[in-house]
Design a protein with these regions (language model features):
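A cross-kingdom feature that marks ATP-driven nucleic-acid transaction machinery
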Residues: 24, 28, 33, 40, ...
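Conserved catalytic segments around the Walker B and adjacent sensor/switch elements
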Residues: 44-60
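Short glycine-rich substrate-engagement loop in P-loop NTPases that contacts/grips substrate
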Residues: 55-85
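Structural recognition of the conserved hydrophobic beta-strand(s) that form the central parallel beta-sheet
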Residues: 91, 127-133
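Conserved Walker B catalytic segment
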Residues: 96-129
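Short regulatory helix/loop adjacent to the ATP-binding pocket of P-loop NTPases
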Residues: 135-151, 167-168
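Interdomain hinge/linker elements that couple catalytic modules in large macromolecular machines
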Residues: 156-157, 161-338
């Protein structure tokens, strides 16, 4: 079993903190394993009795009755009500499958899973943990629905460091596999490449697409697929719903509305399939509305979406770096800086402006810088920031790390992903 110590330790630190622990992330990224295996076995090792851990998996048929939140709440209360001296743990998996129901015993008012979990939270002998695969369970929604009393633990597919801890062997070979097949936990345990491709393709088509269509009652699954094809082929490129709509209109010979594209993009982000990096004006200290960049939560899913036809190592590397920074808890934007050195003012791009509290770094992703022209193209925007924050160029084509004459740190991708270098 692959260790997910970063997330496990976060759960352990927040035990009995008086809040509901909400574990979010794309489906099949390891949320259930984290809660129902890793954390479960940790509790058993600490002496917690097995019958004091209440496990409810809402995507399993034997637990379908608990999709009614009133039934779930009542059954849990029966287990713990007369045992105030004992400590119980409640695990609820894939909580987004619950329904809103009417409580006929209380005037027919509508009741949600949030209402019932808030009621259960009032029991001092119960510590509550739930998982969910939809971003409506994130940020302000968690604060609102759980009345400001929730701790969020967002789980991602395996980082390269986690992936390599499982597969071991030659680091470059492992990185090549990671760039092609990504970090979905089950893939890390597979050896046959056909099995990996089949698993990722089925995951995409039979789980994610169906989830998005059914959950949001989408009428145009074909448009959703076209949008996903387009974003997969354009990772690392600036785009927006209007340009996507125009491209699809041209390709499909039918009018595709920008509002439809924008709505469908939101649904894919709600499902954690893709995420958006906004453009940030470094000198003006403000955000642009459009265009932005879209990245896949797992690069293997992106490659599966394109049937492994479009192997673009430069943009794939950029996607992997973005994901790694997000996994580390950083705030990541696409940097823009105005070049006034010539008569024509040009907006130049820095791949990532990375903020962690009051600390900032700039990162350029450079697959190859084997000519002076390429080196100038990658570094000139870094020279225009006008500040003294650290500037890093992450590369695939160098045998060791070094500082150049401008003080920019050139770092091997493998060293960055294995956290063998300090960012700040």
């Amino acid at each position: 079993m692959i260790e997910r110590n970063y997330y496990l330790n976060k759960l352990i630190r927040n035990m009995w903190n008086g809040e509901i622990k909400v574990i979010t992330g794309i489906r099949r990224c390891g949320k259930s394993v984290l809660l129902f295996e890793l954390f479960y076995h940790y509790l058993l090792a600490q002496g917690v009795l097995e019958d004091h851990i209440i496990r409810i998996e809402l995507d399993q048929r034997r637990y379908y009755r608990y999709r009614n939140p009133i039934i779930l709440c009542e059954d849990v209360e029966k287990r713990i009500h007369d045992k105030a001296g004992d400590q119980f743990y409640l695990f609820v998996d894939e909580v987004q499958f619950t329904s809103t129901v009417r409580d006929e015993e209380n005037g027919g008012i509508e009741v949600t899973i949030y209402d019932m979990l808030n009621e259960l939270k009032s029991y001092k002998n119960l510590d509550v943990y739930v998982t969910g695969s939809n971003s409506r369970m994130l940020s302000k929604d968690i604060a609102t629905e759980f009345r400001g009393r929730a701790t969020q633990v967002h789980v991602y597919p395996l980082s390269f460091q986690e992936f390599y801890s499982s597969v071991r062997g030659d680091k470059q070979t492992a990185l090549d596999q990671y760039m092609l097949y990504g970090g979905m936990p089950r893939v890390a345990g597979m050896t046959d490449e056909r099995d990996k491709k089949e698993y990722l393709t089925n995951l995409y088509e039979e789980l994610y697409i169906k989830d998005i269509v059914e959950r949001n009652n989408l009428e145009r699954e074909d448009i959703l697929n076209a949008i996903l094809d387009y974003t997969a082929s354009q990772i690392g490129s600036l785009t927006n719903p209007t340009s996507i709509a125009n491209a699809l209109t041209s390709m499909r010979h039918e009018k595709i509305n920008t509002s439809l594209v924008s709505s469908y993009l939101d649904h894919t982000m709600d499902a954690f399939l893709i995420s958006m990096a906004r453009r940030y004006d470094i000198k003006g200290k403000s955000y642009f509305n459009y265009p932005n960049k879209y990245y896949y939560t797992d690069i293997g899913l992106r490659n599966a979406r394109l049937n492994y036809r479009q192997y673009d190592p430069g943009h794939m590397m950029e996607n992997i770096i973005y994901n790694e920074l997000i996994i580390r808890g950083c705030s990541v934007d696409v940097g823009m800086v105005l070049d006034r050195r010539n008569k024509e003012k040009i907006q130049r791009e820095i791949d990532f402006v990375v903020n962690d509290g009051d600390r900032r770094i700039y990162i350029q992703s450079a697959y190859q810088m084997d000519t002076e022209q390429k080196e100038n193209a990658e570094t000139q925007s870094l020279k225009l920031t006008g500040d003294f924050f650290r500037k890093i160029v992450i590369r695939m084509d160098i045998p060791h790390n070094f500082f150049d004459a401008d003080g920019f740190f050139h770092c091997r991708l493998i060293d960055f992903l294995l956290q063998e270098v300090e960012l700040y």
